[in-house]
């Protein structure tokens, strides 16, 4: 992916460098681009000399990004070599027929470093950029169990390469083995692999052993973890350690075990990165992480934030306790702790757990706002790393968007927002029926077959991350109820506004069976419905249904993608499967339990079934 070189520099004519061939160019003053990225070198004049060296100063032990641009023909070539204490590393080899831009990431110690560029056969180097960038972590490779909410699952390494994740991260958090990952190649090109561990496993094994939690026991447990023990892995990330007092008796033993662990040459270069939750509240916990930081490990602070009702409230959350003020609390305990911290944002966006809790808000914009705050707020200056948690709860559109956000903020060093869509979705009104039937045109099949109702706690059952991280309590408890009739459907509709002709949009709907909710006896089966959108063309290969369970209830998550032909349209949803509906999942090869009544022009399910409709979200869909 081509980095944004300055146009004037790319267009410059080839000219000879003033310095003699092979003379190293001195390191230049670094330029801070945002809180995450510092530019260490940007070639101003194309190199036509056969050999040239460039010095740069890495401001801290951490990741650097090197991008080189060259156009070569025939036998010409351009090579970029990094000189390290362990030997020379070829970062790029430009040859005829290869891409014009090569990129590489390497983890380097702080201090002076040198690149050598060799131009052969009259070739020229037209661009060379070196930047200090954050650690960018992808969690978690090999987490197969719940990646069912997409036609693209499983999210194996081959898929992640296709959607742009692989080229925009430098650390993989491994949950389970993935045969499509060439771990040797990944590490040879500079990437790292950490394995995921859980404190619940540590607690379970300790209880089974019947032994007290001592430094000896903790050391034996930790030293046996694959990420520390295996030579082809770079460490562990352990979930989780909190400041609520639940682990206060264990922190002294963990601190001593950590000291012993990293004084052992066997674990040189390894890391033990703990997931943390407001750990600044616990002095013993802070002593534990200070020991880890001293050994070169980082802490991974969890912050999973839900959408806010307005953009102003979202901004206040991020600049307040959601991100910036939380960091300030840590800094009171340890100044500059952000330089040893990976900020772990949540991008759960689909069942069984979702931070996309408000169908009136564009979740991709909220994701953009979070990284924008991290890139710009002074409290986060020099932050060591970032990650989104975690892929098993994210749909493939969100994964693709996260790659673009990483690129924008963590590699290009941008301060502006990546997207231009509004925070509040302008397309439909009252998508959660919180205002009754306002904005909707209800057409009941018969008297009393359709109404807006309420069920306490139903929003939580829809996988909304409610009651934590700024979420609105009781959001999603209202729904539209229909009772299926034998002779005609119940339908509800409203105009769709502010569409861009030719653009892709997604429509999400969550359904459940009302009587199953009341009886707490539920059957795992997809609910069938009819969706009609005029002036639109369906995109079936991007659409899917996902049946998920939540607290004794089976629900259906409907995800429908379409391309609009006009700036307005009409959305009609029915509890029948109509002849001309555009949502026909059985033709798309999705495997789920379709009810036997599903036929064109028929009810699509048993007469008398009481369906619950909620979370009617219509928003722009990321096309590439």
Annotated model-derived regions:
Residues 43-57, 98-104, 122-125, 481-502, ...:
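Short beta-strands within extracellular/lumenal beta-sheet-rich domains
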Residues 46-47, 85-109, 534-569, 574, ...:
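Extracellular carbohydrate recognition and processing domains
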Residues 58, 66-70, 74-76, 86, ...:
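Glycan-processing catalytic domains of CAZymes
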Residues 60-70, 433, 490-523, 558-562, ...:
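Extra-cytoplasmic beta-strand recognition segments
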Residues 70-79, 121-124, 485-486, 499-501, ...:
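Extended, low-complexity, turn-rich repeat/linker tracts enriched in Gly/Pro/Ser/Thr and Asp/Glu
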Residues 76-88, 524-536:
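Short, surface-exposed beta-strand/strand-loop-strand elements in extracellular ectodomains
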Residues 116-123, 573-582, 596-607:
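Short beta-strand-plus-loop segments that form exposed binding edges in beta-rich domains
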Residues 432-478:
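Extracellular glycan-recognition surfaces and repeat-rich motifs
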């Amino acid at each position: 992916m081509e980095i944004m070189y300055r146009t004037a520099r790319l267009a410059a004519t080839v000219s000879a460098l003033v310095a003699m061939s092979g003379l190293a160019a001195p390191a230049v003053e670094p330029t801070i681009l945002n809180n995450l990225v510092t530019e260490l070198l940007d070639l101003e004049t194309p190199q036509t000399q056969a050999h040239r060296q460039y010095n740069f100063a890495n401001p801290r032990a951490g990741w650097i990004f090197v991008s080189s641009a060259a156009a070569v023909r025939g036998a010409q070539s351009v090579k970029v070599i990094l000189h390290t204490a362990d030997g020379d590393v070829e970062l790029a080899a430009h040859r005829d027929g290869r891409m014009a831009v090569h990129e590489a990431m390497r983890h380097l110690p702080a201090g002076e470093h040198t690149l050598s560029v060799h131009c052969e056969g009259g070739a020229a180097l037209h661009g060379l950029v070196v930047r200090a960038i954050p650690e960018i972590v992808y969690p978690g490779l090999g987490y197969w169990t719940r990646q069912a909410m997409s036609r693209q699952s499983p999210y194996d390494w081959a898929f992640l390469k296709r959607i742009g994740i692989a080229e925009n991260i430098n650390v993989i958090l491994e949950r389970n083995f993935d045969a499509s990952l060439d771990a040797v190649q990944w590490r040879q090109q500079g990437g790292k692999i950490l394995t995921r561990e859980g404190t619940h496993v540590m607690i379970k094994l300790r209880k089974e052993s019947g032994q007290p939690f001592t430094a000896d026991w903790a050391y034996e447990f930790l030293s046996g973890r694959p990420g520390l023990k295996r030579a082809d892995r770079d460490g562990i990330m352990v979930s989780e350690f909190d400041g609520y007092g639940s682990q206060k008796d264990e922190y002294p033993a963990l601190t001593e075990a950590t000291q012993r662990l990293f004084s052992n040459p066997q674990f040189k270069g390894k890391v033990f990165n703990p997931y943390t939750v407001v750990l600044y509240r616990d002095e013993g916990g802070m002593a534990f992480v200070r020991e880890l930081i001293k050994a070169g490990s980082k802490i991974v602070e969890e912050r999973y934030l839900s959408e806010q009702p307005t953009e102003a409230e979202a901004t206040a959350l991020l600049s307040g306790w959601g991100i910036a003020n939380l960091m300030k609390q840590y800094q009171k305990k340890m100044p500059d702790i952000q330089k040893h911290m990976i900020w772990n944002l949540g991008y759960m966006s689909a069942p069984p757990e979702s931070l996309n809790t408000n169908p009136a808000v564009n979740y991709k914009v909220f994701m953009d706002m979070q990284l924008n705050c991290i890139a710009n707020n002074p409290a986060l200056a020099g932050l060591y790393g970032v990650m989104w948690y975690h892929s098993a709860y994210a749909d493939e559109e969100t994964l693709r968007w996260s790659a673009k956000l990483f690129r924008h903020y963590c590699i290009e060093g941008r301060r502006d927002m990546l997207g231009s869509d509004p925070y509040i979705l302008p397309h439909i009104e009252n998508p959660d029926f919180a205002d009754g039937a306002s904005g909707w045109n209800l057409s009941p099949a018969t008297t009393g077959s359709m109404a807006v109702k309420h069920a306490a706690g139903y929003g939580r059952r829809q996988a909304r991350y409610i009651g934590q991280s700024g979420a609105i309590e009781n959001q999603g408890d209202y729904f539209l109820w229909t009772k299926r009739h034998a002779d005609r459907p119940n339908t509800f509709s409203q105009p769709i506004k502010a569409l861009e002709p030719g653009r892709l949009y997604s429509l999400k709907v969550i359904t459940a069976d009302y009587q199953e909710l009341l009886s707490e006896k539920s059957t795992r089966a997809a609910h069938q419905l009819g969706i009609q959108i005029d002036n639109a063309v369906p995109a079936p290969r991007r659409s899917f249904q996902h049946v998920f369970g939540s607290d004794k209830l089976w629900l259906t998550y409907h995800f429908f993608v379409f391309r609009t032909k006009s700036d307005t349209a009409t959305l009609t949803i029915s509890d029948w499967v109509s002849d001309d509906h555009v949502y026909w999942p059985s033709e798309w090869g999705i495997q789920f339990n379709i009810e036997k009544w599903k036929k064109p022009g028929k009810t699509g399910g048993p007469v008398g079934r009481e369906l619950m409709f909620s979370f009617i979200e219509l928003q722009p869909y990321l096309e590439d």
